[in-house]
UniProtKB/Swiss-Prot annotation:
This is Acetyl-coenzyme A carboxylase carboxyl transferase subunit alpha. PROSITE patterns: COA_CT_CTER (PS50989). One of its GO terms (molecular function) is ATP binding. Residues 44-298 form the CoA carboxyltransferase C-terminal domain.
Amino acid sequence: MITSNRKPTVPDFMRPVAELESQVAELKRLAPKNDKVIENKINRFQDKLTKLQKEIFSSLTPLQRLNLVRQSERPTTLDYIPNILDEWIELHGDRGGADDPALVGGIGKIDGHSIVFIGHQRGRGTKENVARNFGMPAPGGYRKALRLMKHANRFGMPILTFIDTPGAWAGLKAEELGQGEAIAVNLREMFSFEVPIICTIIGEGGSGGALGIGIGDSIIMLEYAVYTVATPEACAAILWKNSKESLAAAEALKITSHDLKVMGIVDEILTEPIGGAQADHQSASKYLRKELIKQLNILLRLNKSELKIQRYEKFRKMGAFYEI
């Protein structure tokens, strides 16, 4: 797991939870061993904390969910991989002179199946975020992903992708290196692969940066994750010329897992631990591993032709609407 000494930034709506967690931790630190009175008091605080977390998390707005998944303690791809896979090794480079740290990948095993994994990788502290470009891949990152996916297709290995990015890097250099072309080629090629592809949105799924590794037979989305064509801030700036309208933009964009399940964009919503995946990395990883194995076993029953046809039809249905 990647660690950082940086003190986490707590969103306003999470402050009551953070304060109560601090009180519980302090009580545990100061409590003498085998003091039943103190133990009972700690248990009451713990029950109160759990109840408060359930109340807050049951009524999160879309914008609050976005702020939640942007927390530095949220598990990243490289936090999940050691807990999900039985063995793994990271592979590097696009064989064109680049090795983008904002997008990682490699090979591994899960439940006896050899797989290729690919995922966006954010940092935690400022230094690490700068090194990983805040999880925004350059063209070389998408070309590295394509190289690994072609390797998977050649050797008959299922592909697992983990989506967590505000978007692809939009700098001048990225455009000069063919950002749009790199993402477009990935989209085209992912429709042609003859192996199962399972995509999991673990945090923030933003725009083409997410789609560049987001074409799959099964799309899993963590309960509090978000998936959107543009960030609410960017949408507000474009439509209202005012980023303060991001709350309205977040509502209109339908970025939550439940909205996207209703619209047929995602297939499965994965329940997160109380307090979100950032509160319990181990439990979040356990839930995700179980779901990945389940989806993998379903998809491995299909032949190559069935996989490609179902994948194509799945995405062709997206965007359908009904007039009332």
